[in-house]
Amino acid sequence: MSTKWEKLEGNVGVLTIEVDAKEVNNSIDAAFKKVVKTINVPGFRKGKMPRPLFEQRFGIESLYQDALDIILPKAYGEAIDEAGIFPVAHPEIDIEKFEKGQNLIFTAKVTVKPEVKLGDYKGLAVEKVETTVTDEDVENEVKALQERQAELVVKEDGTAADGDTAVIDFEGFVDGEAFEGGKGENYSLAIGSGTFIPGFEEQVIGLKSGDSKEVEVSFPEEYHAAELAGKPATFKVTIHEIKTKELPELNDEFAKDADEEVATLDELKTKLRTNLEEGKKHEAEHKVRDEVVELAAANAEIDIPEAMIDTELDRMVREFEQRLSQQGMNLELYYQFTGTDADKLKEQMKEDAQKRVRINLVLEAIIEAENIEVTEEEVTAEVEKMAEMYGMPVDAIKQALGSVDALSEDLKVRKAVDFLVDNAA
């Protein structure tokens, strides 16, 4: 087999591939063995039709497409290896010559991975992030715990205020007609939570148990139910009960209820401070890593093929679909609720997809430029770390991974980011 690679404009080139006649004949033979199994001919058992009779009745040309399906993937794969190129999309194949006893000649128009011209990626100036934890930070955490342990108690003589919970009956009307999903009984409405239509909760403030009121609101223009979007509505509301939060007293008992590993309020505050410090440090490290990567990517020159962005968009949509399924939703429901479609979703994701592709290409280029490698011991250590994290045997992790090649590449990327951080200004 012979291969010729001709680079065209941008990231496109043409492979001209010539395959020996012997391989062509072998592919036609393989195609016959495949096709003959599907043919019933009187006087012969299924799959036993003689080759000469087959060619006489159907013509040898009837085998050519199946033969091409057999020979092309292998020939194309060998050709891109020989040419040392990295396609990022399916090729455009053009068959110039294919017949029994003759060499196969075909061309493949290929979009390849772009050249990356790295800019400055050492000595990048990054902003230092403040990681100090103040007494106020700790007190805010204590207050958050106190809020989570609060009990709702009936507000006997009071009126509804922001932060209270009103137990209500409601029924909504648009143009004087009740609408589907607009009615509820004994519904616990947390005032100020923003769970109802804008303007609804504010009009409940000041009401008391036993009060009734007509609440006038308008549905948002982007409301998920298109038939209601932008329309004014009237809700008849009856208040059954007003509840308010009763916060627990801040003492050692509160601390023990909040965290069984502590015995006093002071111990709880110390633990909260430690957790906050670790969290801020972790957040600062991530911010620096993200910043150096984005700076290195911005400094590079790359002509990114649309095919790479399209591939990344498809991957992002699949990831989004998986997240939706974990919430009991699917894409069709999402499109219905948001008034979008597949094209609009991809358009929203396109900027992030471009950013992802650029960053990946730049990190790959840095790995090559700095000769970043991963040892077998480092891969083994990472597998053992994963086994401990997931509580699984090491062999089970290895089996789940199948090949450690992807893990090895991930570790190289991590090392590349480490390199950028270590060499930042």
Swiss-Prot record:
Keywords: Cell cycle, Cell division, Chaperone, Cytoplasm, Isomerase, Rotamase. Involved in protein export. Acts as a chaperone by maintaining the newly synthesized protein in an open conformation. Functions as a peptidyl-prolyl cis-trans isomerase. It catalyses: [protein]-peptidylproline (omega=180) = [protein]-peptidylproline (omega=0). It comes from the Bacteria. Coiled coil: none annotated. InterPro entries: PPIase_dom_sf, PPIase_FKBP_dom, Trig_fac, Trigger_fac_C, Trigger_fac_C_sf, Trigger_fac_ribosome-bd_bac, Trigger_fac_ribosome-bd_sf, Trigger_fact/SurA_dom_sf. Consists of 3 domains; the N-terminus binds the ribosome, the middle domain has PPIase activity, while the C-terminus has intrinsic chaperone activity on its own. It is found in: Cytoplasm. The keyword Cytoplasm applies. Its EC number is 5.2.1.8. One of its GO terms (molecular function) is protein folding chaperone. GO terms for biological process: 'de novo' cotranslational protein folding; cell division; chaperone-mediated protein folding; protein transport; protein unfolding. Belongs to the FKBP-type PPIase family. Tig subfamily. This is Trigger factor. It comes from Bacillus mycoides (strain KBAB4). Residues 163-248 form the PPIase FKBP-type domain. Its main location: cytoplasm. GO terms for cellular component: cytoplasm.
